[in-house]
Amino acid sequence: MKILVDADGCPVKDIILKIAKKYHIKVVMVKNICHELHDDYAEIITVDQGRDVADITLINHTEKGDIVITQDYGVAAMALAKNAHAIHQNGWAYTDENIDELLMKRHMGQEIRRKHKKYTKIPKRTKEDDLQFERFLIHYLDENILKIRGHQDEI
């Protein structure tokens, strides 16, 4: 089991690393060449810039039982299809029950933006957002780590 991070624009990389070290979980961060990222604990995979290159690379490194941390609903859907776990950087899990609705909302939002050329402003991330993610990831690992690590025996 490992944690894979869609690292381009991910605001919780430091939190992920802190928790992964505590739980002795390998971390793989995938980023494109436009972002600088260095860490002695995590494996950093750097890919060319291009549409979905980092996303496809991340999914190609994902295995059953892994945890993928991403804000991209499409990446989350592909992770779930590989029987991996998917977590949003705001501290909630993507599931088979919510992914279809999330993808539909994303599609509808894209259509509206394309039609009206109107874009919403994303609110600035707060310290509380980071705390919520940290609490969620710890709780998620505490609740699921035995199940997740149990999948390793099946591989």
Curated annotation (Swiss-Prot):
Database matches in InterPro entries: UPF0178
Domain of life, per lineage: Bacteria
Family membership: Belongs to the UPF0178 family.
Database matches in PANTHER family: UPF0178 PROTEIN YAII
Name by which UniProt lists this protein: UPF0178 protein Clos_2709
Species of the source: Alkaliphilus oremlandii (strain OhILAs) (Clostridium oremlandii (strain OhILAs))
